[in-house]
Amino acid sequence: MRVVAAMSGGVDSAVAASRALEAGHEVIGVHLALSQSPEAVRAGSRGCCSLEDSADARRVADKLGIPFYVWDFSDRFKADVIDDFVDSYAIGETPNPCLRCNEKIKFEALLDRSIALGFDAVVTGHYARLHDGVMRRGVDANKDQSYVLGVLTDEQLAHCMFPVGDTIKPEIREEAKDHGFGVASKPDSHDICFIPDGQTQAFLGKKIGLRPGLMKDQDGSTVAEHDGVYGFTIGQRKGLGLPREGLDGKPRYVTDIDAATGTVTIGQRDDLRVGGITADRLKRLDPAVHGREFECEVQVRAHGGVVPATARLVDDPERTTPAGRVKKEDESPWRLELDLHEPLQGVARGQAAVVYQPDADGDILLGSGTIRATAPWSDAGAAGTAGERATPAEA
């Protein structure tokens, strides 16, 4: 096959490209120029968009003897990832930009261009396993990236290859060393690529501006003022501008964010326990495939744990989410309702709920949805039905 190897400049994509070549495919290397901000592209910046990363990717391609190109998707990245990130925080959501980038850039923009140019597939260094259309977690549990691929469609997966998913990270580094790749010991990137200094609140403040509001406790009493709800996320404990502990001597956490009123509610850790989740913008979840109700496991963070749940797929006629975002006409007509069998802590609107089917050969990824509402956990059991759930905006 003729394939495009997406080369970030890291060790995983380098080995993925090498394995695709060794498998007999015709390979070209492509580095994506995504962010044009001076902070992101400067030499020495640790992200996936810096000049250093592009140079590292080119050196690997030269070592492999494959053609190398830089494709500029910066305008689309700004519109589909950065602006979406800012808009989501402005309405009190907590988005994951890596999922959005995978959905709109790496496996839409890149894949569409690749297919248009006559290529058959895109190769990446993600730690996930894909065989015959079935995606499983990567063998390396510490590096598994199936969660951030949960937004892909069946059509996109039909043109994807993940050559490193069957291998653990130390072996990938050894393989890169054997090939003489200079990136063999290059550290992994953990920061948001367009916020390489890690100062997310400052970045959002510049984009959104001051939107003062009140911080209240569980009984509605005002305890402080704030500059904007974008500076907070559900479950946050640090950076609240409050004494570390309340009058009861217990730590305080952000338990709710109401962007419409500018109110941030704080409470105790137990107030963060969630027993029910409602999600929309579904990917790969369809009653015709999975049935109206099924048992599963759900994960809500890239490196978070999983809990068992009962899932239901129900009609979703609503065109506006509780946070105020108008749904697009091409979005799934279904919504996902999850009754958790164990509580999850600090689940936020805007996060992805990725659903798996437990399997001895590796959990199978069924699909995902974007969380739009939660219901509290009850010590007597999970939350009530979706019809009984109060969304944060209604609580």
UniProtKB/Swiss-Prot annotation:
Q: What is its main location?
A: cytoplasm
Region entry Interaction with tRNA, spans: 143-145
| Disulfide bond annotation, renumbered to this chain | C101-C193
Where in the sequence is the active site?
A: C101 (nucleophile), C193 (cysteine persulfide intermediate)
Q: Which terms are listed as keywords in the entry? A: ATP-binding, Cytoplasm, Disulfide bond, Nucleotide-binding, RNA-binding, Transferase, tRNA processing, tRNA-binding
Show the GO cellular component annotation of the record: cytoplasm
GO terms for molecular function, please? ATP binding; tRNA binding; tRNA-uridine 2-sulfurtransferase activity
Q: Name one Pfam family in it.
A: tRNA_Me_trans
Q: Which NCBIfam families match?
A: PRK00143.1, trmU
Name the record gives this protein: tRNA-specific 2-thiouridylase MnmA
Source organism (scientific name): Corynebacterium jeikeium (strain K411)
